[in-house]
Amino acid sequence: NELRQIMLSPRELASDSLPNKNWINERLTFTHGYGVAAGPVNQVTSSGQPEFFIKDIPPQTTTSLKITRPEIYYGELANEYVLVRTKSQELDYPAGDQNIYTTYQGKGGVPIGSFWRKLVFAAHHASMRILLSQDLTGESRILFHQKIQERVKKIAPFITFDPDAYIVIAQGGRLFWIIDGYTNSARFPYSAPLSRQGMNYIRNSVKAVVDAYNGTVEFYLSDPADPIIQSFAKTFPHVFKPIDAMPEDLRAHVRYPQDLFTIQANVYATYHMQDPQVFFNKEDLLSIPRRTIEGRERDMEPYYTIMRLPGEEKEEFILLLPFTPNKRDNMRSWLAARSDGKNYGKLTALEFPKAKLVYGPKQIDARIDQDTIISQQLTLWSQRGSQVLRGSLLAIPIEKSLLYVQPLYLAAEQGSLPELKRIIVAFGNRITMDETLDL
């Protein structure tokens, strides 16, 4: 009965990387990806490698999580088209010195058994092999528009879709993709533009769900009050469903989108000022913290975490971003977007007292570099021929201050997998480094 944040990574098939690229391999044999790797974000093995809840092929699980339909025919790296239920076997996964094959049993695609259909698709895909292949039978089907971004855009071209789709495991063990959809405009009255394109209105009005096996697509109204999506819903009444119609096991995975939150954070940096005179003079502008990562200075990105917000009784899944005063490095405030239950979409902000110094991310980076114990250890690792990789610096609100956590990974120069070796924690004026966060 505890909230646990986990990472999921689908094992998709990148046909561009096939060692032996030919029409049969690309269209008949290597037709789909297989399964996911999943594990907790805060656990590693004794050697510093990720701890897995789901691993291997076929998927092996150590928890109640299960995958009953691991094949991924529709995803982010899918083929232009594939042919299934043919005389050629589809590779499912390798097992030792042999391969395991399968036959597609889903309802995706369209039949391609007749001569005329073969002719039409051969012309459409500019491939005479579709028309002339002896591998096709009366039961064969062609699966196309397998890339999920392309698929949802074909159905709803009037919606702008988030490029960062994420895969989830439904309660029955099936895999689904969730994609955030936006309605936007550049013609909203009395609204400042957000970009060079002039957009001054945006709403996360749609959640698209794509079945990774069958390719079926459902659109759910996540912001039914948006007048633009109301108009589209009336025009296409059978395309959109209310968010309450989304199955509960999928709805539990819905999260607040990072791109929308980043836009709102940039607006909040100016419009958090309530006093008209202060606002007019821009006396209290905020900035998104900047950090030096791999030699380049970049804006800090919002990140998902589980924490208990001030005034709340229990922890929840949120999207968080801290702020610094304009052209200064100390921390000024943070903004959080909530994702759980009835609180979905609510934004919470907390400002630190101006009289209290709370270190910002750039200042913490500098203090880590200046710490003699930490710098000596980093130098020692580097002298032994290892590469030190500093992970994301997370700022976790603790009452009216911040706890900073940064993992350190070690990798050999000859391409070995990085291993978690140390964790740096900073709170107030204290900085420490240890092998674990456990007390």
Residue ranges and their predicted role:
Residues 1-439:
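Soluble extracytoplasmic regions of secretory-pathway and membrane proteins
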